[in-house]
């Protein structure tokens, strides 16, 4: 068997997320069907992260096995041909060792969340950013984010449907950068809880609106109660950037 590692980008607006689900269109299903159309083989695609409905990806990593060898550049061309008309595409493909696993071999995952902070929305990016019309205090958000760095119990930022065995995670990076009218929040960790990034963003926005003091984030983290944290930020602003191996 030949194992292929692919890098995938997609707009998740009209998709049900990464994972294959009955009755709806997912990124996994689109790619698996495209692979079948050019190879004649039914494969199971394994991704480095399971993005939710509406979440986008710049460099989602996945792998699959084929019994027949194909040149990687031909796989890129074939998948991109058969994924049309969906906005899902393969950017890179390489042959890897059979011990490689897109999910379990990953040592870090990286996300960015985009906030458009201006009085009027974007026609072009309306489903690719979270538009917030009131000015946000970025310096307060940056100060508050420091309480979240490191190894903590992130129960307060965990979805009720999360299947992770432990709420303990290590957030290695949380950078908040203002670029003109956009605020970008960069997250890195070995792994994340379900909705963890979006729940943190929703809480930081409360700080940015001066509804919360920056120091309140520490209390929310320590109480380990989802009800104590802010709302879940919309899926449209979240992007899976890449995974490290």
From Swiss-Prot:
It comes from the Bacteria. Substrate binds at residue 111. It holds the Pfam family PseudoU_synth_1. Disulfide bonds: none annotated. It catalyses: uridine(38/39/40) in tRNA = pseudouridine(38/39/40) in tRNA. Homodimer. This is tRNA pseudouridine synthase A. The gene is truA.
